[in-house]
Amino acid sequence: MKLIELLFILLPLLLWPLTFIVLNTIFIYAMLVSVIILAIISLRIYGREIKWSNNSIIKAITIGIIGALILYLLFYIGYYATILLGIQKGVSNVYTMIYGNAPTLILMPTLALIGICEEIYWRGALQVYVKKKSRFFKKIPWVAGAMYYGLIHLSTLNIVLFAAAVIVGIVTSIIAYKYGILSSIITHVVWIEAIVIFFPIGA
């Protein structure tokens, strides 16, 4: 395995604890830098192999918006599950960390860019890597991508954030695998803007 491929796979193991724990007071900016680094490496290694879209732009957008609506509904239901389980404080902690010192005018484009870069790495390049390197997950690379995305969020020490990552990972990974990451990017960006800026749940 080449050094750059090793870096490509292992870097989130460093960046996620650094972003969510060490630099949580400037979380949104640290997250932006982290995912930009991952996206640059992804495009450098697998940019030509990433499945961007296999549909018309209208269909890609439609699929992306439907995916965002599904995600938002799942999170709406999930919030009430956290209340029943008595862990809803984990939700407010996530919002507090996201809002931080970032004004809305900065937060909106920053969240969009984070969503784009995350999809390039987690649902784009990572699925390419899994298809090329894994025998077990070769035909279901979205499963490996969703698993890694969920598990990496255990490092945040927030069970709600871990559960949220599992849901986001599964939905966007399936969309990217079937329709391309243009649709999963739209899903991610529309959903995150809705749940953080326009229609927050449990903030």
Residue ranges of predicted features:
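Non-cytosolic membrane-interface motifs at loop->transmembrane helix junctions
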Residues: F27-M31, K89-M97, F162-I170
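Alpha-helical transmembrane segments of multipass membrane proteins
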Residues: P12-W16, I37-L38, G67-F75, W191, ...
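Transmembrane helix-loop-helix hairpins at the membrane interface
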Residues: T104-A203
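Juxtamembrane membrane-interface segments at transmembrane alpha-helix termini
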Residues: I21-V22, I41-K51, L73, G100, ...
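Alpha-helical transmembrane segments of polytopic integral membrane proteins
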Residues: A39, L43, G47, F75-G78, ...
